[in-house]
Amino acid sequence: MTAPMQDRYGRPLRDLRLSVIEACNFRCGYCMPADRVPDDYGFDSQQRLSFDQLETLVRAFVSVGVTKVRLTGGEPLLRRDLPSLIARLTAIEGIEDLALTTNGTLLARQAVALRQAGLRRITVSMDALEPALFRRMSGDRGEIAQVLTGIAAAEQAGFQRLKINCVVQRGVNEDQVLPLVEHFRGTGHVLRFIEFMDVGSCNGWTPDAVVTSAQLHERIHARWPLVALDANYTGEVAQRHAFADGAGEVGFVSSVSVPFCGDCQRARVSADGHLYTCLFASQGHDLKPALANGEPALATHLRQRWSVRGDRYSEVRASVPRRGKPVEMFLIGG
């Protein structure tokens, strides 16, 4: 592997978020609201990168410094025969961590196959425990029982330390914070609370809808005292805190209130092969022409694109007007 490339601010590229499908079986309001995204939304399957293309793309990213790959969507478990892609990616030398983010509804039937294929970690999105609220937040498409069954199946398949992500919106699900903590304390899984972010243009974001990590920390700490932990690695987005009684840990992702642009080492690629160097980007770069020329040519192209990267949207959110229409979260996996 050659030396890792760096962008204009000296940030290397270590982490690839790879969307394998743009479709989703949920219609969550903060990502893919039902009143803005039709039920039949999705690319023609011919527009999606094939497994051969995805493997070549990942090999090129690894050759320029990527060590962590996370498969996203949409809902990645909707992609047919996903375990076979995972098996191919697992065989790539240099990948230290291969993970997947899912809403969990299809996990029960696929957990064993995912584990056998070589997937190392799973993150499950779960914004409420209360069944009626969960159903409503999913656009009347999901049941919390399905997700909990999926988590149990993942445990049985050998995934012992899942991450559970909850996006907290004021007036929507902030009353679910303590019940979620109580449910996952002591299970070995890591619950992470994510500030509601202005990703895309269809989620109706306003600053008033944000419950900050500091506010969430105060609420949880009053019930279960917390102790701050060091980050596991440079660029880790979640601020880690352990329960003082030893019942595990909880994390806070504070992109709005405490931006972490300075340590961002991530690139995102959509299912149709467009590179986004920031979650809040308004323009992607089509990688398919370079991809068609093979892995070495794509690697050279990636170095060129990353070297001019200057994204730091969250740090300048309040002072610099946004230009262009931002990419939707469901295209690049959050």
From Swiss-Prot:
Residues the entry annotates as binding [4Fe-4S] cluster 1: C24, C28, C31
State the free-text cofactor note.
Answer: Binds 2 [4Fe-4S] clusters. Binds 1 [4Fe-4S] cluster coordinated with 3 cysteines and an exchangeable S-adenosyl-L-methionine and 1 [4Fe-4S] cluster coordinated with 3 cysteines and the GTP-derived substrate.
Entry binding sites for S-adenosyl-L-methionine: Y30, G74, S125, M197
Coiled coil, from the record: none
Against InterPro entries, the record matches this protein to: Aldolase_TIM, Elp3/MiaA/NifB-like_rSAM, MoaA, MoaA_NifB_PqqE_Fe-S-bd_CS, MoaA_twitch, MoCo_biosynth_MoaA/MoaC, rSAM
CDD domains in the record, alphabetically? Answer: Radical_SAM (cd01335), Twitch_MoaA (cd21117)
Q: In which pathway does it act?
A: Cofactor biosynthesis; molybdopterin biosynthesis
Quick one: which residues bind GTP?
R17, R70, T101, K163, R266, A267, R268
Q: Which residues make up the binding site for [4Fe-4S] cluster 2? A: C261, C264, C278
Cross-referenced SUPFAM superfamilies, in alphabetical order? Radical SAM enzymes
**Record keywords, A-Z:** 4Fe-4S, GTP-binding, Iron, Iron-sulfur, Lyase, Metal-binding, Molybdenum cofactor biosynthesis, Nucleotide-binding, S-adenosyl-L-methionine
Could you tell me what reaction this enzyme catalyses? GTP + AH2 + S-adenosyl-L-methionine = (8S)-3',8-cyclo-7,8-dihydroguanosine 5'-triphosphate + 5'-deoxyadenosine + L-methionine + A + H(+)
Spell out the Pfam families in the cross-references. Answer: Fer4_12, Mob_synth_C, Radical_SAM
Q: Which GO terms describe its molecular function?
A: 4 iron, 4 sulfur cluster binding; cyclic pyranopterin monophosphate synthase activity; GTP 3',8'-cyclase activity; GTP binding; metal ion binding; S-adenosyl-L-methionine binding
Q: Does the keyword Lyase apply?
A: yes
- Which ranges carry the Radical SAM core domain? 8-244
GO biological process annotations for this chain's record?
A: Mo-molybdopterin cofactor biosynthetic process
Which leading EC class covers this enzyme?
lyase
This enzyme's EC code(s) = 4.1.99.22
| Cofactor(s) annotated in UniProt | [4Fe-4S] cluster
Q: Which family does it belong to?
A: Belongs to the radical SAM superfamily. MoaA family.
**Subunit record text:** Monomer and homodimer.
- Function field: Catalyzes the cyclization of GTP to (8S)-3',8-cyclo-7,8-dihydroguanosine 5'-triphosphate.
Q: What is this protein called?
A: GTP 3',8-cyclase
